[in-house]
Structure formats: structure tokens, C-alpha cells
Amino acid sequence: MIESTLFPIVAKINEYLSNYILIFLLVGVGLWYSIRTRFVQVRCFGEGMRKFFGELNLRGGAQKSGMTSFQALATAIAAQVGTGNIVGASGAILTGGPGAIFWMWIIAFFGMATIYAEATLAQKTRIVEPDGNIKGGPVYYITTAFKGGFGKFLAGFFAVSIILALGFMGCMVQSNSIGSTMETAFGVPSWIMGIVLVVICAVIFLGGVQRLAAVTEKIVPIMAGIFLLGGLVILAARIQYVPATFGMIFRYAFQPQAIIGGGFGYALKTAISQGAKRGLFSNEAGMGSTPHAHAQANVAHAHDQGVVAMIGVFIDTFVVLTLNALVIICTLYTKDGPLAGGYTGDITATLGKTNLDQTAFGSVFGASLGAKFVAICLLFFAFSTILSWNLFGKINANYLFGRKNSKLCSVIYTIIALVFIFLGTVSGSDFVWELTDMFNNLIVLPNVIALFALTGMVIASLNEMQKDKLKV
């Protein structure tokens, strides 16, 4: 009764926040930092790539506290490259047409400047305690931006929202994806998958930051490699359609009415809004989630982690999400695909109830193998996201309850999180999904406000590090 009453209210709040307020805030902060840093995402992209590929030995050795820069990036990518990269691309294409992918690229480009600022601020405001424990994330730069009661209120609001959005309900959503896909593709009962998942997660969670970092730095390259290899096989098999696929992305970015119907104005608005929304919530730039990971990095200067953080957005959107989109478009929308020729009919009736990715990969691998491949990718993506989101939530729980209660808080938080993870594998609720989206939307507000307020700190850090090369 309560759920049925609240569901339409929460859905309406989400619609208003995501369609109006958040798009303008997140795009706005990306534009702002792009201009104020004179497009740091362009000028420092090469530097970020060199660091990513190990020129400065980012992997390092075992850490007594915190993470290496690579481990921090891997933990951030684990959060960014989740089920949203599969669902996000297909959802954007379904609603906004292939042209929505172009607008995803535009959003990600500006998002790279935003995440540079987030990572820089996370490094500048982090606290290293006497025992070596590192505390850092948006709550710390929010209270730096705003002193007194207002800052504490914004930080507390952010902390509660992210605990609910990512630490508890968000992990439940991810585990539901694991449970349902593994049962469908491999016949594994969801409750068995739930028990296995809880045991594995418990072992990792109880090992602290170092154990989680050791896992993410290994699992992220593996999961990305598997998905990229599968996607490249599809593109190789459909190589003759790849040029046309890129052509459709660019053409329908500005002429979307030809494929999604409606008037030009409505179709263009739909393509842009779908690309923007899906892109923003895929790479998480401006949401305040990944700064928790970047704060843990042991680097010489905050700028170093800022440029590395930009590579996370690049990998998430320009590599993984783009490859997924190319696979979908070149198998389903080109000449001999089921959605070719400006298709505007009932997609569910045409393809059945299977999702676009299963159909796309199944067109080359075969239906059974295609479904299994997508299921394995979802398993990796969702599992790695659970690990990162749990850490982000725990950091905020410890902030709320203080250092004296941190051990007890961590234990209680972990137990509750494991319960949500198990429940997610065996049950699903559209209302929980809506609540998760709502709290995801809400965490953006205090984070973006602080990002605007601390522009001077970001610019000073950039000038300090590169005063001879990038005087702003």
C-alpha cells in the first residue's frame, strides 16, 4: 500500500530532477571547469595516458595505507563501468536513436574536466590519520567550501544519500542484475548465487581498503578485456557496416526524427536528453562517487590524480560504452539488421523480450552463447561496482559516526550491506529502483555546489603543478 502510494511520487521527483535540474547542473559544471582550466582534458590528456600506462610506475608496491594511483583509478573505473554501460547504451539508443551516442561523447568530454576537479579536491582536502587511515571524499571538500552549520548540513545530506543510493540500495540493484542474468543464462538458482556473492563480498569487505584495491586492480583489466575482445569480434564480423554505423551516429545526432519519429524539435530534444542523461550517470562525473577512490591514492601532487581520473571517464564512455553502442548499431540497425531502414515500430515485439545486447552479440555468437557472454560481462561489471560502491558508502558512514566509533560502524554497515546484496539477488522491486535513482540524483546537488565554490582551489593546484606549461 505504502509502496504503491509513494512510487508515482518518487518517479515524478526523479523525472523532474533528471530531466531539468541535474542535466543543467552537470553540463554546466563541466563547461565551467573546461573554460576555467582552459580545457585541461585536452592539454593534459597525454599526461594522463602516460601515467595510466605506467610511465611513472603508478602500480607501485604494497601499500600500508591508501592505494596506489592505479588502484584508485581501477576502483573508480569499477564503479563507473557497471551495468549502466550495457543498459545505458541500449537504453539511449532505444529512446533517442543512434544519434544519442554522439551526445554521450559530448557530455563525457566536458565530464573529464569535472572529474579532474573532483579528484584534485579529494586529494587536497583528504585527512591522513596517525594510524595511516585516509579519509577523503566530497564530504571533506564540502565542509572546506562551507564552514559552520550549512557545510555540516550539506555534507551530512550527501553522506546519508550516498549510503542509501550506493552502499545499500545501489548494491541491491547490482546484485539483482547478477542473480537474474546468471539464472537465465546458466540456470543457477538466484538464492545460491546470492549466498556465493555474499561470502565473496564479505571476505573482501572485511579485508579493508588494501584488499579491495588488490581485487579491483586485477578484476578491472580482466573484465574490460573480455568485453572489448567480444565487442571487437562482433565488429570484425560486421566490418563492412562499421563506417555506416559511425555515419548513423553523426547523422541521427542532428536528424533524429528519421529514426525515432515525431517532429524535428521533439526528436532532437529526445536524442540530446537521452544521450546526456545516460552519459552523465554512466561515467559518474559530477556525482561525487569516484572522488572517494581518488582520495585514497598516494601521489606526489593532487594534479597527478586529477589527470589520471580523466582517463576513467575516457575508458568508461569513449571505450566501453562506445564499443557496446557500435555493436548494437552495426548488428541491429544496419542494412540486414532487424531495426534497419528507419525502424519506428514496437522493438519488443520485433526482438522479443531479450535485451538489445543479447540480440546483438547473439547475431554473431548465436543466441545461447550471446546470452551467456552478456551474462558473464554483467557479472563482472556488477560485482566490481558492488565492491567500489560499498567502499564509498562505508567512508561516509564513518564520517557520520566519527573516528571513535569507526570499527563498530564498519561492522554494522558491512552486515547491513551484505543483507541488501543477498536480498537483491532473490527479489526485485521497481520501487527500490526508483528510490535508488532518487538518492543518486540527490547526491549530485551538494557535490556540484561545492565544486563551483572551490574553483579557486582547483585552479591554484593546476597552476602550482604546471605553472611553466599551463598558466591559467
Regions found by a protein language model. Name each.
Residues 39-67, 91, 97-100, 113-149, ...:
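Flexible loop linkers connecting adjacent transmembrane helices
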Residues 60-94, 121-124, 130-139, 143-145, ...:
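Alpha-helical membrane segments and immediately flanking helix-loop junctions
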Residues 5-6, 36-41, 84-89, 167-179, ...:
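Transmembrane helix-loop junctions in multi-pass membrane proteins
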Residues 1-83, 93-100, 111, 422, ...:
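N-terminal alpha-helical transmembrane segments of multi-pass membrane transport
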Residues 116-126, 130, 232-248, 256-263, ...:
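Extracellular/periplasmic helix-exit of transmembrane alpha-helices
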Residues 25-29, 36-49, 158, 175-182, ...:
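Membrane-interface loop-to-helix entry segments
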